[in-house]
């Protein structure tokens, strides 16, 4: 069945919200307490920070999953108001989480879109569940949106929602943004449901990607898979949008690199408590001459093993000194029920143990590894404390950690080692750019960053900060929504 097929009559009424954000998760998490009751906990993030003021001004609503399993998926709860923000929970059963989220979203789409670092799994049952859950999100959005409202759908878990919502509510202006990389054409063509995904996205008025390459790939696929006429010229960043001509309307396609709340981070990092904590961190590490830092979700795309291998060989070759150089790796737990992630955790912990066994001393490991979430201010203090930030993904849509590190370095200290295969590399050209598949190149670049002169470091960091502070998450959201406003239905 085509996305959205046959369900147009289910929702006839209009909601009250003029602006609706649709994402896999709500900006708050619902938690089950020991007594069986539930409570809400705010889940801070860049997307929430950027869109919250707009949501408040425009009678906004946020549609998403609250984070706990609920088998009664057919019973719709009333909207929840949290801090003047209307939340529309979408319920997911245990089977939904297993097949739509852990299955199709994260064992099919995630590896496919990240260059098949791990082989994608194609299960028809997972696809059927993905269609069903996307329809549930579309119907919840239709009930929330006022007549003529603007709807912004977020990310790879919900790629069918635009077309489903278009069928339910043709009066809406619909935008879609993909937060992960969009794959090369030859990889995307492996997907058995490739045409359905492209048709799903073309339900939007504006389809946004981080990079121009993703936009160009999507235009090509629109021509190849559905025979649409498309623009042929190069797509620009926040400009020169591509176009896909459908029977009754035109879909715009653009590149909008996401960013962070850089001003807030800059201000927090300047606070004396953060500076004091940064000094304490270095003291707790034994006051080494150099501190290298990695901060990642524990994910096979992030290249954690690459930096550990490079550091191990630098120690073995004497190019990094075991008595005055340490590596701190902060790894946030992620998708722990998925087999490949469990294996990755075991592999990383084995690698850390080997390096410390080979080069550390009792009470003085050379790699400090934490596998747990780190509070926000503690993370900022680590950014301030680190001499070299290691961001070495094999593929990443953007990588906001790189930008966060730069935003925290008002002292113009530190060095950023950044994978060429992140979206951030297109903007942060003054970082030490590396190919994470080239181990010798990674080692040489890390060594250069460790030994850079003060003048060289300040020059690079000044340029990086100019970029990050000027292009913040508010500018990202405004640029997308301005383009969307120009793309929607003309007749209301």
UniProtKB/Swiss-Prot annotation:
Question: What are the binding positions for D-glucose 6-phosphate in this chain?
Answer: 25, 101, 155, 335
Q: Which GO terms describe its cellular component?
A: cytosol
* KW Transferase (keyword) present: yes
What pathway annotation does it carry? Glycan biosynthesis; trehalose biosynthesis
Q: What EC number(s) are associated with this protein in UniProt?
A: 2.4.1.15, 2.4.1.347
Specify which residues bind UDP-alpha-D-glucose according to the UniProt entry for this protein.
45-46, 297, 302, 400-404
Entry-linked CDD domains:
GT20_TPS (cd03788)
What cystine pairs are annotated?
Answer: none
| Annotated keywords | Glycosyltransferase, Transferase
Per its record, the protein catalyses: ADP-alpha-D-glucose + D-glucose 6-phosphate = alpha,alpha-trehalose 6-phosphate + ADP + H(+); CDP-alpha-D-glucose + D-glucose 6-phosphate = alpha,alpha-trehalose 6-phosphate + CDP + H(+); GDP-alpha-D-glucose + D-glucose 6-phosphate = alpha,alpha-trehalose 6-phosphate + GDP + H(+); TDP-alpha-D-glucose + D-glucose 6-phosphate = 5-methyl-UDP + alpha,alpha-trehalose 6-phosphate + H(+)
Record site feature (Involved in alpha anomer selectivity), residues: 110, 180
Gene3D superfamilies, per this entry?
Glycogen Phosphorylase B
This protein's superkingdom?
Answer: Bacteria
Question: Which GO terms fall under molecular function for this chain's record?
Answer: alpha,alpha-trehalose-phosphate synthase (GDP-forming) activity; alpha,alpha-trehalose-phosphate synthase (UDP-forming) activity; trehalose-phosphatase activity
Q: Which InterPro entries is this protein grouped with?
A: Glyco_trans_20 (IPR001830)
Q: Name one GO biological process term.
A: trehalose biosynthetic process
Q: What does this protein do?
A: Probably involved in the osmoprotection via the biosynthesis of trehalose and in the production of glycogen and alpha-glucan via the TreS-Pep2 branch involved in the biosynthesis of maltose-1-phosphate (M1P). Catalyzes the transfer of glucose from UDP-glucose (UDP-Glc) to D-glucose 6-phosphate (Glc-6-P) to form trehalose-6-phosphate. Probably also able to use ADP-Glc, CDP-Glc, GDP-Glc and TDP-Glc as glucosyl donors.
PANTHER family, per database record: BCDNA.GH08860, TREHALOSE-6-PHOSPHATE SYNTHASE
Outline the subunit composition: Homotetramer.
Concerning its family, UniProt says: Belongs to the glycosyltransferase 20 family.
Q: What is this protein called?
A: Trehalose-6-phosphate synthase
Q: Which organism is it from?
A: Mycobacterium avium (strain 104)
């Amino acid at each position: 069945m085509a996305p959205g097929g046959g369900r147009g009559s289910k929702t006839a009424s209009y909601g009250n919200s003029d602006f609706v954000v649709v994402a896999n998760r709500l900006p708050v998490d619902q938690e089950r307490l020991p007594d069986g009751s539930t409570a809400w906990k705010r889940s801070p993030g860049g997307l929430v920070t950027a869109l919250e003021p707009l949501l408040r001004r425009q009678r906004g609503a946020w549609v998403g999953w609250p984070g706990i399993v609920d088998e009664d998926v057919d019973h719709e709860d009333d909207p929840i108001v949290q801090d003047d923000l209307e939340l529309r929970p979408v319920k997911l059963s245990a089977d939904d989480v297993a097949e739509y989220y852990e299955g199709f979203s994260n064992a099919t789409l995630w590896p496919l879109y990240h260059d098949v670092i791990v082989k994608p799994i194609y299960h028809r049952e997972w696809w059927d569940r993905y269609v069903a859950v996307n329809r549930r999100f579309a119907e919840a959005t239709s009930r929330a949106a006022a007549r003529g409202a603007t709807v912004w759908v977020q990310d790879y878990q919900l790629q069918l929602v635009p077309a489903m919502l278009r069928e339910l509510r043709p009066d809406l202006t619909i935008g879609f943004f993909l937060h992960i990389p969009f794959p090369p054409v030859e990889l995307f063509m492996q997907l058995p449901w490739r045409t359905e995904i492209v048709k799903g996205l073309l339900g939007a008025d504006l389809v946004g990607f981080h990079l121009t390459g993703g936009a160009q790939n999507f235009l090509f696929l629109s021509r190849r898979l559905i025979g649409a006429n498309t623009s042929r010229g190069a797509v620009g960043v926040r400009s020169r949008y591509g176009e896909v001509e459908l029977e009754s309307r035109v879909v715009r396609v653009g590149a909008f690199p996401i960013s962070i709340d850089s001003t807030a981070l800059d201000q927090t990092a300047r606070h004396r408590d953060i500076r004091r904590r940064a000094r304490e961190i270095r003291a707790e590490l034994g006051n080494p001459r150099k501190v290298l830092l990695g901060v990642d979700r524990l994910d096979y795309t992030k290249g954690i093993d690459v930096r550990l291998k490079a550091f191990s060989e630098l120690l073995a070759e004497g190019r990094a000194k075991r008595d005055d150089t340490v590596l701190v790796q902060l790894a946030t737990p992620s998708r722990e029920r998925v087999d490949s992630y469990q294996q990755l955790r075991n592999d990383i912990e084995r690698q850390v143990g080997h390096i410390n066994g080979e080069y550390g001393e009792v009470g003085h490991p050379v790699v400090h590894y934490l596998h747990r979430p780190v509070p926000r201010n503690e993370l900022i203090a680590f950014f301030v404390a680190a001499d070299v930030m290691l961001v070495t993904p094999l593929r990443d849509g953007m990588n906001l950690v790189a930008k966060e590190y730069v935003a925290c370095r008002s002292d113009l200290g530190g060095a950023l080692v950044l994978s060429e295969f992140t979206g951030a590399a297109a903007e942060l050209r003054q970082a030490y750019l590396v190919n994470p598949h080239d181990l010798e190149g990674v080692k040489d670049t890390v060594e250069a960053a460790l030994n850079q002169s003060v003048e060289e470091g300040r020059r690079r960091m000044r340029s990086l900060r100019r970029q990050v502070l000027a292009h913040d998450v508010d500018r990202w959201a405004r640029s997308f929504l301005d383009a969307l406003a120009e793309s929607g239905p003309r007749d209301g």
